[in-house]
Amino acid sequence: MLRLRLLCTLLFLCCFLKTAAQEEFIDPPSKHLVTIPFVQFTGGVIVFKALLDNFKDSLNFILDTGSGGISLDSATVESLGLKPGPPERIIRGIGGVRKVGFLKKRSLHLGEYEIDSLDFHIIDYEVLTSLYGQKIDGIIGYSVLSRYILKINYEKQEIDFYTKGTMKYPKGGYLLRPYIRMLPYLKSTISDNRKSGFNYLFDLGAGLTVLFSDDFVNDSAFLKTKRKRYLKQGEGLGGRVDMYLTVMKSLRIGPYRFRNVPVNIFNDDYNVTSYPSLGGLIGNEIFRRFNVILNYEKQQIHLTPNRFFTSPFDYAYSGIELYLVDGVAVTGKIPAGSPAEKAGLNEGDEILAINNRFGMQLDDLKQALQSTYGKVKIIYRRKGVLLTTVMNVINISKK
């Protein structure tokens, strides 16, 4: 009888301990707050509208995981009659360092939902406005991203904001586990001359595929030395910066592989990439091929391939970067030896038509140059005189 009681006691304890071991505290389910539409600019950059404080006019904001805060354009602040505090903090970006002032304890309205207690730093975004051809009033980064879970659907062009909490991720995707210290950092695998690990910044605000620092490229020696590099112009915090365009064999993010990927290389004078900790960044020309869930609290990013996953990359190289100046599409700096220089184009030329198509918007002109190889007819104006030239656009994947 004693043995029977002992056996029953042991069985009870085993069952109790097993059940207790399965108990855990979990966060409540996340709740949907608001859905907002967005548009995409060159390179997949996300832009959406929001209201500041009680002002009635909507502002255009870029969603940027590469931003450690939230910011407003200095011209926008002036037009609203607001006065930021004196410069108090230094921020660093590609091409420059700036000391900035703040507008503190402000609110942002996304549809009917309000985000309060935001401290906006103030900076000049004129170069972004001219690059995209539409007014850029600010950039939304960590200050907002850290408060919510965001679902970004590139097919519907919508962003869903959720409260923090448990969330079931969709099937058929992959969960990345970044290290997030204001900015999300991850590791991928790249291959060309040889295979190499690549620590990168997950940057939805960058309208490109991959950006390497030249220090990383030189020290890793992963890129084939025979790869030809093409000089182009990029944009950063300090204005316009020179970059080189080339192609690498493959990029692997989790289980997803991209082949013959166009990449950019720049001289990181201000060590924005924190080399050797990071080698560069991966931008939204890659991540727009997924529907993305950002969960900063759990340090998780979920990717699900969407219908853009197999979209071809842009291999066209003309040497032209267009900017909107006083309502006109104007060429930026023309790189030496580029097709644009060989065609006789100069910085400041006004581009009126491509292949006899007049009346195109800035983004349409850019798309026309990026989607065409071979001979392209350009009609332009220089100092009031109409001129015509033929430019031979290069396919860099064939070089």
Residue positions per predicted region:
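Pepsin/retropepsin-fold aspartyl endopeptidases
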Residues: 20-399
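Bacterial Sec-dependent N-terminal signal peptides
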Residues: 1-26
